């Protein structure tokens, strides 16, 4: 462990996923804390003004639902938790919409499940939507879709969701705001000798031994889930900060490089992590052959693959599948995530994007494989 806090990580981060827990957005379980949410939105607006992109992952739906339904304690029955989530999600979305608009920002509600991110096509659709929202200057507010998936309530948590979203959008950093000042060497509520861990590697096995214990009765995650979330986020190159959410101007100060909380540093660079994931960990579902001009652009300019440069399409693949890209000699030169299924790819092969709507009945991405989802293999 080191106490040399690498503040440059957050200072230089341009795309940030911020996760706030139930204890920070509710009045001790008695509905949403309007003042607290307003403060988060004010800080987010300052980050956006500083040319940063921010995605919120917010807990609080079940707690708000409990308040609206008049329940004093968190229920244990799945259907009651689902009902509370459904009722509370209305208030949560309305509160963020109001407070973000007061700060000059648009908002969008996005409800996800782990299944959405496990399916390649839905993963790519969710990614495209979120990146479009960020490009439009809108702040996505994400929560798990607890109402429709039983095991999300039983075993899921928004710390994990925050990490998955960081992977999804290739965020530079994940900020987990909680009711603790960070990770301590032991539980500070039980051990007076416990000290704050200022910085560590996200994959350090000693971290899990330090974490442990459960959270409050309002949320589902304890410190261990935050450590595991940081480890998951590091898979796509995102470092994680775990910090006390009641720290004044926490988000703004972190973005300025202040040493707050615990920094868990990713050991893999963002681009390297994604390229490795595409190149090594997904089974090829098909291939496309490209002409000499497309080959030159892919190799020499790092361009996206456009359908007009394709000569043939082989195999049966879906949107989001990994496909090989071959030159005219049949040699694989790259691979990447397909934006179009094989049936559609055959229709737009050798065609400019201006004809896609006429050929397919809709207009989507102009690229067959976007350069962000493409890795050269030769």
Swiss-Prot record:
Cell compartments where the protein resides: Cytoplasm
CDD domains listed in its UniProt record: AAK_G5K_ProB (cd04242), PUA_G5K (cd21157)
Keyword Methyltransferase: no
Recorded GO CC terms: cytosol
Residue ranges occupied by any PUA domain in the UniProt entry: 285-363
A UniProt-annotated Pfam family: PUA
GO biological process, one term: L-proline biosynthetic process
Superkingdom: Bacteria
Pathway of action: Amino-acid biosynthesis; L-proline biosynthesis; L-glutamate 5-semialdehyde from L-glutamate: step 1/2
InterPro entries registered for this protein in UniProt: AceGlu_kinase-like_sf, Asp/Glu/Uridylate_kinase, G5K_ProB, Glu/AcGlu_kinase, Glu_5kinase, Glu_5kinase/COase_Synthase, Glutamate_5-kinase_CS, PUA
Enzyme class: transferase
Annotated EC: 2.7.2.11
Sequence positions that bind substrate: 59, 146, 158
Binding-site residues, ATP: 19, 178-179
HAMAP family in alphabetical order: ProB
UniProt family annotation: Belongs to the glutamate 5-kinase family.
Protein purpose: Catalyzes the transfer of a phosphate group to glutamate to form L-glutamate 5-phosphate.
Protein name: Glutamate 5-kinase
UniProt organism field: Albidiferax ferrireducens (strain ATCC BAA-621 / DSM 15236 / T118)
């Amino acid at each position: 462990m080191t106490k040399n806090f690498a503040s440059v990580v957050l200072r230089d981060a341009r795309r940030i996923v911020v996760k706030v827990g139930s204890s920070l957005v509710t009045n001790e379980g008695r509905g949403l804390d309007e003042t607290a949410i307003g403060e988060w939105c004010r800080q987010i607006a300052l980050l956006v003004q500083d040319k940063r992109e921010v995605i919120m992952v917010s807990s609080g739906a079940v707690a708000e639902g409990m308040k609206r339904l008049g329940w004093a304690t968190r229920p244990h029955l799945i259907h009651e938790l689902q009902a509370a989530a459904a009722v509370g999600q209305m208030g949560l979305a309305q509160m963020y919409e109001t407070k973000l608009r007061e700060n000059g920002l648009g908002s969008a509600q996005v409800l996800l499940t782990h299944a959405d991110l496990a399916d390649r096509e839905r993963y790519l659709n969710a990614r495209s939507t979120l990146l479009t929202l960020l490009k439009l200057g809108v702040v996505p507010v994400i929560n798990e879709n607890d109402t429709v998936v039983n095991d999300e309530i039983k075993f899921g948590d928004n710390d994990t969701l925050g990490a998955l979203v960081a992977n999804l959008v290739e965020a530079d950093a994940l900020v987990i705001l909680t009711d603790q000042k960070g990770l301590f060497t032991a539980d500070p509520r039980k051990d007076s000798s416990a000290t704050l861990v200022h910085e560590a590697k996200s994959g350090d096995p000693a971290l899990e031994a330090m974490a442990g214990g459960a959270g409050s009765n309002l949320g589902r995650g304890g410190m261990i889930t935050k450590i595991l979330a940081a480890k998951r986020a590091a898979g796509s190159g995102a470092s994680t900060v775990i910090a006390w959410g009641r720290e004044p101007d926490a988000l703004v100060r972190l973005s300025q490089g202040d040493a707050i909380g615990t920094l868990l540093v990713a050991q893999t660079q963002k681009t390297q992590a994604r390229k490795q994931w595409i190149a090594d960990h997904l089974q090829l579902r098909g291939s496309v052959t490209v002409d000499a001009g497309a080959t030159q652009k892919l190799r020499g300019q790092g361009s996206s693959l456009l359908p007009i440069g394709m000569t043939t399409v082989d195999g049966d693949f879906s949107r989001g599948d990994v496909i090989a890209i071959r030159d005219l000699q049949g040699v694989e030169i790259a691979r990447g995530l397909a934006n179009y299924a094989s049936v559609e790819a055959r229709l737009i092969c050798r065609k400019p994007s201006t004809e896609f709507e006429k050929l397919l009945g809709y207009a989507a991405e102009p690229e067959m494989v976007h350069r962000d989802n493409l890795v050269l293999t030769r």
